[in-house]
């Protein structure tokens, strides 16, 4: 670099300017290079840590007893836009009401008897049930049954990036249930009141029961499925059939016994949790052997494929940021030759 150019760049910097030629990448790049890598979390380690948290972390210390699946490539989060957590609520405990700009989902892993209350509607939950908590909805949890563990998925990293992270504790501390059981199913399902007004952006809070999911899997399990992901079920917005939340799509993937998928990549980042089964996944140059309870993340534009090495079906709970990529016209997919 010439002394004249160096002096000019210093002059630009002093006035809060920067030359395009100072961009290290410039015009040399041709495709996305993710800023974070893949990562694999072992379920046995996560659940052991959560059991210990249940002994030493009270709800007087932490508003929620939560352990984050932290990607060491990032300052925070599981991917650049999403975070997956594990939460524990012990019998007799109440997690107090609050609301936040981040949209959230809950996938129940263990136990029965916890009520997830969202916007005045109570959802009784058990293992395999899936509940949405859309952005800026009041929500609290009550456990009147067994010890419960569930996955929390949030778009909090995206909200922090956008710097729109509003958060509000509920002065009531706990919500009063104001809606009858099955209210949302009756007002936002295939049949709904003609006068009901719906939010065109945010879906209602909704509970997808595992019995219904399992029944659907049994009906479509003999279909060819997707060559890259196996059998895929979308947790669809009950109002318009769109993605689960505006920024997040959640799915169930099933790999039949011995099934091997083809390799592909896409501009959405994807988080997998092994709900059932065992197998192996290849993410870029990484090989992950997984079993029930494990989780792993596939960064955007990373080739990946899966193999079910067992004699029984393997089932993933999956969340991704494809709706965000679709909304801004950035979604692309590429199959490996």
Feature-to-residue mapping (PLM):
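C-terminal functional regions that serve as terminal interaction/effector modules
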Residues: 1-42, 239-246, 250, 254-257, ...
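A short, N-terminal "cap"/entry segment at the start of jelly-roll beta-barrel domains
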Residues: 1-80, 169-170, 175-247, 332
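Conserved short histidine dyad/triad with adjacent acidic residue
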Residues: 65-74, 82-99, 232-239, 251-265
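Conserved hydrophobic/aromatic beta-strand scaffold that supports enzyme active sites
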Residues: 66, 84-88, 105, 122, ...
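A short beta-strand-loop-beta hairpin characteristic of the jelly-roll/cupin
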Residues: 90, 94-127, 137, 265, ...
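A short hydrophobic beta-strand segment most commonly corresponding to one strand
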Residues: 105-107, 132, 145-165, 272, ...
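Conserved metal-binding segment of the jelly-roll/cupin
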Residues: 118, 124-145, 150, 155, ...
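Contiguous mid-protein beta-loop-alpha structural module that forms a pocket-lining wall or clamp
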Residues: 131-188
């Amino acid at each position: 670099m010439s002394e004249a150019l160096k002096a000019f760049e210093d002059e630009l910097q002093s006035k809060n300017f920067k030359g395009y030629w100072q961009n290290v990448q410039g015009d040399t790049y041709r495709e996305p290079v993710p800023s974070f890598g893949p990562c694999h979390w072992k379920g046995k380690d996560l659940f052991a840590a959560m059991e210990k948290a249940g002994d030493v972390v009270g709800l007087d210390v932490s508003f929620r007893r939560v352990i984050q699946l932290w990607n060491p490539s990032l300052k925070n989060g599981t991917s650049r836009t999403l975070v997956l957590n594990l939460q524990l609520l012990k019998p007799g405990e109440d997690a107090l009401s609050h609301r936040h700009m981040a949209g959230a989902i809950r996938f129940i892993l263990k136990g029965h008897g916890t009520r997830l209350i969202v916007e005045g509607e109570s959802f009784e939950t058990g293992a395999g049930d899936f509940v949405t908590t859309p952005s800026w909805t009041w929500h609290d949890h009550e456990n009147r049954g067994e010890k419960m563990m569930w996955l929390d998925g949030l778009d909090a990293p995206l909200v922090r990036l956008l710097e729109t992270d509003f958060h509000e504790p509920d002065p009531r501390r706990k919500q009063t249930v104001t809606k009858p059981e099955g209210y949302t199913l009756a007002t936002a399902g295939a049949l709904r009141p003609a006068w009901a007004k719906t939010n065109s952006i945010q879906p209602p809070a909704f509970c997808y029961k595992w019995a219904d999911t399992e029944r659907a899997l049994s009906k479509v399990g003999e279909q060819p499925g997707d060559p890259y992901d196996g059998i895929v079920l979308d947790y669809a917005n009950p109002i318009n059939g769109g993605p689960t939340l505006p920024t997040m799509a959640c799915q169930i993937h099933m790999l039949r016994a011995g099934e091997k998928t083809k390799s592909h990549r896409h501009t959405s980042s994807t988080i997998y949790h092994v709900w059932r089964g065992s197998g192996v996944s290849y993410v870029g140059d990484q090989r992950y052997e997984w079993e029930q309870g494990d989780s792993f993340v596939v960064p955007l534009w990373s080739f990946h494929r899966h193999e079910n090495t067992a004699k029984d079906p393997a089932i993933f709970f999956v969340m991704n940021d494809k709706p965000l990529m679709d909304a801004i016209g950035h979604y692309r997919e590429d199959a490996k030759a």
